[in-house]
């Protein structure tokens, strides 16, 4: 038969083993805290640590105060086990298990708090706060917002500066003065009406009292004590009514004088404002006239600059370009003359004689056909002579032939040119000027024509205005 101490140790060891195997299987976070109920009847004949069987797992977010109280209670519960004489190794093992569970709970609690703290800044940054949006705005956007906020004040300040420069600020001061005087006139007229009403009431009171006094005097022989007292009261109040009537009359006169003064001052201010506005409008009109004359002067100056400097330069450039083209054409003609056989002198002379007239007047298609037929006839008539001359002058150099042809050419005289220019030619020229044929014009030429027309129109209108003002 086993002894009692040995049985007690065996039961205690089995209880500790059960608590050790049950602790790792439990989760560090319990779904709900288990209430600790220690009844008095829970003790057995042999002492077993109830804390080892029903261990309380604290929640992750419990306070440190509750933890300290739980640890104190655990110590109190574990004290009887020590008193019963259990070995130290068995007592140290439950304490180690409790420390492990508390450490794991603390680490989980701290990790949860750190994760919560890490989640909070991300949610605030990604939440679109006004400060976050303001920091992401560009500098240009901020400047534009500031400029738009100050736009109304800037416009007001600019208008005020313009009024100061033109002298309209004094007219605005007169306007404000006129508004104040209008208010003063309305108040004066209101006082006049009030004084009239008070004066009329005083007159009515005095007339009523006098009428009653007269009625009492008519039946003086039949006065009663009440009538005597009433007569005495009315006689005493008659002087008061007279003084009140005089005072209201004086107040009415003063109010009427003030109203008349306010009306006169208002009329004077209105007249001065009208005069100042007329002077200001004349000043602005004069300034606009001088501005118009200035613009006209600028237009005339530009016109003179174009006519004196730009137009000669443009003409020189055109002439130079035309001369270059003519020289190129002459060079090409010389090359062709040297490369081809030289025609007879008479034929070249006839062509040179016909060329100026053809250059002056543009022939019609019928004239071209007739000239071609006549040239063919002359060529056919002169073929035997030209062949003979070619055979005779075969030994002559091309340079001598060209020099002789140039010497034989004579330019047409002025009389022949004038005779060729007839009325029909002038009519054709006018018809060409008024025709609807397309013309290529550069933008500069159009600008020059527009500026010239504007300057001419401005000059003409200035002369007309000057003549009208002088008359």
UniProtKB/Swiss-Prot annotation:
InterPro entries membership: MDM33_fungi
Transmembrane region(s): 290-310, 448-468
Residue runs in coiled coils: 168-269
Segments of skewed composition (Polar residues): 88-113, 348-361
Gene Ontology annotations of biological process type: inner mitochondrial membrane organization
Subunit text: Homooligomer.
UniProt record similarity statement: Belongs to the SHE9 family.
Name of this chain's protein: Sensitive to high expression protein 9 homolog, mitochondrial
Organism: Emericella nidulans (strain FGSC A4 / ATCC 38163 / CBS 112.46 / NRRL 194 / M139) (Aspergillus nidulans)
């Amino acid at each position: 038969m086993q002894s009692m101490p040995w049985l007690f140790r065996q039961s205690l060891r089995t209880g500790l083993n059960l608590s050790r195997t049950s602790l790792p299987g439990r989760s560090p976070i319990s779904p709900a805290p288990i209430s600790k109920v220690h009844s008095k009847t829970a003790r057995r004949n042999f002492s077993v640590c109830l804390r080892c069987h029903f261990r309380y797992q604290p929640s992750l977010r419990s306070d440190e105060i509750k933890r300290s109280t739980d640890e104190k209670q655990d110590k109190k519960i574990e004290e009887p086990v020590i008193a019963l004489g259990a070995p130290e190794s068995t007592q140290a093992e439950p304490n180690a298990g409790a420390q492990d569970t508390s450490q794991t709970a603390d680490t989980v609690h701290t990790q949860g708090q750190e994760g919560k703290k890490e989640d909070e800044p991300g949610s605030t940054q990604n939440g679109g706060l006004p400060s976050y949006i303001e920091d992401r705005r560009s500098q240009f956007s901020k400047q534009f917002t500031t400029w738009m906020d100050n736009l109304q004040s800037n416009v007001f300040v600019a208008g005020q500066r313009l009024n100061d420069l033109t002298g309209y600020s004094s007219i605005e001061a007169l306007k404000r003065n006129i508004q104040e005087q209008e208010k003063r006139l309305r108040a004066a007229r209101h006082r006049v009406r009030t004084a009239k009403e008070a004066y009329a009431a005083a007159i009515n009171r005095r007339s009523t009292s006098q009428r009653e006094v007269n009625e009492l005097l008519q039946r003086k022989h039949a006065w009663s004590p009440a009538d005597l007292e009433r007569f005495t009261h009315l006689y005493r109040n008659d002087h008061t009514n007279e003084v009140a009537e005089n005072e209201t009359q004086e107040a009415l006169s003063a109010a009427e004088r003030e109203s008349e003064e306010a009306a006169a001052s208002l009329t004077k201010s209105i007249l001065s404002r009208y005069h100042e506005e007329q002077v200001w409008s004349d000043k602005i009109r004069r300034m606009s006239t001088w501005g118009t004359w200035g613009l006209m002067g600028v237009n005339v100056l530009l016109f003179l600059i174009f006519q004196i400097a730009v137009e000669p330069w443009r003409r020189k450039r055109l002439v130079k370009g035309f001369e270059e083209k003519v020289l190129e054409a002459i060079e090409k003609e010389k090359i062709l003359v040297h490369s081809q056989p030289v025609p007879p002198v008479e034929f070249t002379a006839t062509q040179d004689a016909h060329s100026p007239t053809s250059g002056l007047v543009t022939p019609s298609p019928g004239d071209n056909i007739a000239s071609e037929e006549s040239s063919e006839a002359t060529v056919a008539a002169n073929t035997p002579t030209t062949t003979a001359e070619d055979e005779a002058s075969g030994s002559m150099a091309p340079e001598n032939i060209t020099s002789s042809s140039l010497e034989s050419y004579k330019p047409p005289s002025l009389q022949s040119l004038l005779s060729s220019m007839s009325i029909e030619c002038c009519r054709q020229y006018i018809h060409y000027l008024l025709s609807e044929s397309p013309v290529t014009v550069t933008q500069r030429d159009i600008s020059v024509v527009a500026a010239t027309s504007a300057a001419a129109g401005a000059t003409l209108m200035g002369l007309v205005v000057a003549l009208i003002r002088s008359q």
